[in-house]
C-alpha cells in the first residue's frame, strides 16, 4: 500500500505540472478553466496532506513537504495572475514567467517525490531479502533438526535390538520376555 501510495504521489506531482501548463495555455487563449484549476488545487492539497479520495499518502519527507508548501503558495499567486489574464489579456501580465517558475518548482517536487519513492523501494527490497534469508535459515534449521531426529530414531532401533536380542545367538533374550 505505502509503496503504491508513493508512486501515486510521483504521478500526481507530474500531473500538477502538466495540468497547470495546459491551464495556462487555455487561459491565454481566453478559455477559462475553473474546473481544472479546482482539480489542481485539490491535487496540491492531496500531495501536501494526503487524500483518501485521490488515494494519496502524505510523504513524511521534510524536503518534499517544504517544496509542496512553496508550490502551493506559488499556485495561489498563479491563480491571481490567471484572474488578471482574464481581465486584461495575457500580454499585459507576467503569466508566462510565473508559469515557468511554477513548472520549475513542480519539477523539483516531482524529483523529490521520486527520490523518496526510490528510497522506500530500496528499503522494501532489503527487507524482502532479509525475510527470504530468514526463511532459508528456518528451512535449514528444520532440515537439520529432522536429520538429527532420524539419526536418533536409527540409534534407538539399534539400541532396542541390543536390549532385546542376545548378541551371541541373535535370539530374543530375557528382557524381551519380561
Regions found by a protein language model. Give the residues of each.
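Heptad-repeat coiled-coil alpha-helices
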Residues: 29-32, 46-49, 84, 115-118, ...
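N-terminal extracytoplasmic segments of bacterial inner-membrane proteins
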Residues: 3-45, 73-84
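Juxtamembrane amphipathic/coiled-coil helical coupling segments that flank
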Residues: 90-130
Amino acid at each position: 500500500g505505502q509503496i503504491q501510495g508513493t508512486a501515486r504521489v510521483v504521478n500526481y506531482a507530474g500531473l500538477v505540472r502538466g495540468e497547470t501548463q495546459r491551464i495556462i495555455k487555455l487561459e491565454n487563449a481566453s478559455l477559462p478553466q475553473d474546473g481544472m484549476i479546482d482539480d489542481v488545487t485539490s491535487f496540491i492539497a492531496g500531495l501536501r496532506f494526503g487524500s483518501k479520495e485521490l488515494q494519496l499518502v502524505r510523504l513524511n519527507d521534510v524536503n518534499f513537504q517544504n517544496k509542496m508548501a512553496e508550490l502551493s503558495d506559488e499556485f495561489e499567486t498563479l491563480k491571481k495572475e490567471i484572474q488578471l489574464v482574464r481581465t486584461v489579456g495575457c500580454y499585459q501580465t507576467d503569466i508566462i514567467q510565473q508559469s515557468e517558475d511554477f513548472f520549475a518548482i513542480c519539477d523539483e517536487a516531482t524529483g523529490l517525490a521520486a527520490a523518496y519513492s526510490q528510497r522506500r523501494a530500496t528499503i522494501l527490497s532489503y527487507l524482502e531479502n532479509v525475510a527470504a534469508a530468514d526463511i532459508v535459515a528456518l528451512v535449514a534449521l528444520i532440515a537439520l533438526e529432522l536429520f538429527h531426529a532420524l539419526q536418533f530414531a536409527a540409534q534407538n532401533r539399534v539400541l532396542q535390538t541390543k536390549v532385546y536380542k542376545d548378541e551371541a545367538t541373535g535370539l530374543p533374550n530375557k528382557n524381551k520376555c519380561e
